[in-house]
Amino acid sequence: MAQISESAAIPRRTANHHGNVWDDDLILSLDSPYGAPAYYERLAKLIEEMKHLLLREMEDSNHDLIRRLQIVDTLECLGIDRHFQHEIKTAALHYVYRCWNEKGIGMGSSDSGSKDLDATALGLRALRLHRYNVSSGVLENFQDENGKFFCNLTGDKRVRSMLSLLRASEISFPGEKVMQEAKAFTREYLTQVLAGSGDVTDVDQSLLREVKYALEFPWYCSAPRWEAKSFIEIYGQNQSWLKSNINQEVLELAKLDFSILQCIHQKEIQCITRWWRDSEIAQLNFYRRRHVELYFWAVTCIFEPEFSPSRIAFAKITTVGAVLDDLYDTHGTLDELKTITEAVRRWDLSLIDDLPNNIKIACQFFFNTANELAVEVVKKQGRDMTALLKATWQRYVESYLQEAEWIETRHVPSFNEYIKNALVSSGMCIVNLIPLLLLGQLLANNIVEQILSPSKIQELSELTIRLIDDIRDFEDEKERGEIASIVECYMKDNPDSTLENALNHIKGILHVSLEELNWEFMKDDSVPLCCKKFTFNIVRGLQFLYKYGDGISISNKEVKDQIFKILVDQIPIED
């Protein structure tokens, strides 16, 4: 294929991104047996059996508040709670909420005078995640006069209570001081336990595995499929837990559910791999080849089988976004980028006819994908939404052009000027639009407006994604000549600030933004929950991928292991 011969004389910057770390032939060879009808029939049978078992277990008079909450937590950790939402609410959470008061809840009956930290923390977390209105002030009942948290239990039960408190503290809203205190206290306490230097020794190994997971992957930077696979492994090694017949059946169901979903996800990544491999752009070596990593990001956001069109769209959009990012940041000249931007403004591909072939291929890749997805949206929503989609794409590329102009002139804008543009260039404007319109629900225009900019949840998701990315990448980008980052802009506005101070300030903004995003996600409004959950999980998924660095630009060992564990590695299931 023709490469860049006609533009070889033009000096071009390069980002020196590494190549594709995945063998496309390996991806295309994946073959899971769990797509067979017999496994779906077995899953449906297990779900129905489990519904009866759960109701009987949770409504048993000998198993009151704490047992109900433990069951809910187990189902959620294993990623199978979506099958039992009715049972969870009617047999567990409605009852727990009726027993809830400002003092907390006890282990036994609803009027128990002895309040329990484990039960209260489990209840706070579960009720908030299911949008019950409960105050974090209940945790103040478990603080001494010095603000330290206490637990009257000993041994593993004490560690379990502190673990529950840590996990509850992550579901925090702005201004909740007690939640911040709980998080700081429990992280320090559990870190000591894990190191063997705490006040509890000889801790159960399975419990230590749960502690390790909670410390390494807090709720706001975890991913549902990763959590499910991890807890299948944790519970599967806990022989005392497996002594219960209901736990054995729960684990069997979780394994089968994960395997069936993995089969679906494998077929989808094969679809994306063929789409990428068959495109002309796959033959060019100056654009990042991250279709596997970007599809994996989609799985971290939304994994349920019914949302396959949204996952496919998400992977295609973000892959196109990576190509545009490389084109605008490093490969294209400013004159070429102005021509491309004008072509997108007019939605007229003929305007790029005189550009070098390699750039035309990138533009054709963009237009073909954008037009293909627009057709899918029209079919799904039953009305023409191409004007909205085009306008959103146009805003997106215009923000890239602004950044390219800053690079060309070596201009560092003010912090506020940078943020205004960066919210758009984060890509959330388009990443959160098309997949959302393909979720399966018909969304009225007013609902779309509530979700998208200038809505609060959209603005916060744009901001957090930009902050996460810039905190990780600003040094690498500076080396490539991209000097306008949130860190550099802050230091320009605050010339006396050190790099450490600037990073701490920006991390503080990120922390507050994540708490505000929690609130926007949890609060009750007219936006369908699946839409808000998708928006929220885009941020969670990116934090998960950026846990060990920029997991998209640099597909390091940790990210590759994560992808392998979720998309490739099968769980052994006994027939």
Swiss-Prot record:
Mg(2+) 3 binds at D469, E477. One of its GO terms (molecular function) is lyase activity. Binds 3 Mg(2+) or Mn(2+) ions per subunit. GO terms for biological process: diterpenoid biosynthetic process; green leaf volatile biosynthetic process; sesquiterpenoid biosynthetic process. Pathway: Sesquiterpene biosynthesis; Terpene metabolism; oleoresin biosynthesis. It comes from Picea glauca. Its EC number is 4.2.3.104. Terpene synthase (TPS) involved in the biosynthesis of sesquiterpene natural products included in conifer oleoresin secretions and volatile emissions; these compounds contribute to biotic and abiotic stress defense against herbivores and pathogens. Catalyzes the conversion of (2E,6E)-farnesyl diphosphate (FPP) to (1E,4E,8E)-alpha-humulene. Mg(2+) 2 binds at D325, D329. Disulfide bonds: none annotated. This is Alpha-humulene synthase. Its cofactor is Mg(2+); Mn(2+). CDD domains: Terpene_cyclase_plant_C1. Mg(2+) 1 binds at D325, D329. The Asp-Asp-Xaa-Xaa-Asp/Glu (DDXXD/E) motif is important for the catalytic activity, presumably through binding to Mg(2+). It comes from the Eukaryota. It catalyses: (2E,6E)-farnesyl diphosphate = alpha-humulene + diphosphate. It is an enzyme of class 4 (lyase). Belongs to the terpene synthase family. Tpsa subfamily. A motif (DDXXD motif) lies at residues 325-329. Keywords: Lyase, Magnesium, Metal-binding. Pfam families: Terpene_synth (PF01397), Terpene_synth_C (PF03936).
